[in-house]
């Protein structure tokens, strides 16, 4: 097997017992939207995954890695153009943005129970931070703008159990079936917010 299957921890026993395996990827996305006077843009660059696997002893292997679990990357702005309003207040603009996300750090081990059937166990640690902010500004100094936002820091633990069964379907074919069950994850953390004008 030339690839790491990070979805099912039981799959990591299907490998050369003398080799180390690693996988790394990155992703990038640039988006810009505009409708009337409203604009939105986001630029993201993140790891896709980082994983490596090592053999432990015969018919057993281990794997560890890091991958994004969720992400937030947006920014939009718009202006008030109604002459009846800005004639008194001056130009008004609103801007909002959000960045950050959660990552999953994991470690797994698997063993062949008997020919074709393997069992894998995985420990997951979730962590990350999200920042969101909102700004309201006036060009007329007689009016106060507003700024508010918050930072959320979260972490939690979870697990996964995987099974995989492989059998031959001919001289050059094989069929692989697998299943995983994940435990519920209860995230905890703290929120720091601010509001001022």
Per-segment meaning from a language model:
Residues 1, 55-197:
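Outer-membrane beta-barrel porins/channels
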Residues 1-73:
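N-terminal, post-signal peptide beta-strand-biased segments of exported outer-membrane/organellar beta-barrel
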